[in-house]
Amino acid sequence: MGRRSRRRGEEQLAAPESPYEDAEGNVLVLRGAMTPATRAQYAKVRAGGLNQEDAWQRSVEFLFERLAVRWTIAGAEPIERQKELLARFRFAGQDERTWIRGTLRTHLAEHFPDLTPP
């Protein structure tokens, strides 16, 4: 009982967040931290037994799934739940996917220069 009550007063650490806005005003917020386990999983996805195109698509989806925190589209209520973010990503059109891929590349270069972008 004593340990639980001591933890309640502590602030939880939060990963830094970086917002990226497209030309239409949509805002994608990406997490600025990645665990060593996530980095190892990403390396497996990139080197997996898939053909190059499939590995590339899967690596973009993997990074989006792990790094996306919030996505505000057309001024609507932001999407924040992981399942909803991933579903919206899968529903995205070609232009949105191109922008997301470019945004992920920029984000990796700024925050994770040791990782190979998709």
Question: PLM features: what roles do these ranges have?
Answer:
Residues 26, 31-118:
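Short, surface-exposed, charged amphipathic helix/loop patches that serve as local interaction elements
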Residues 13-25:
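Short acidic-hydrophobic surface loop/beta-edge motif
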Residues 8-15, 57, 72-73:
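RecB-family 4Fe-4S metal-dependent nuclease core
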Residues 1-13, 40, 44:
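Short Lys/Arg-rich cationic patches that frequently serve as NLS/NoLS or arginine-rich RNA/DNA-binding motifs
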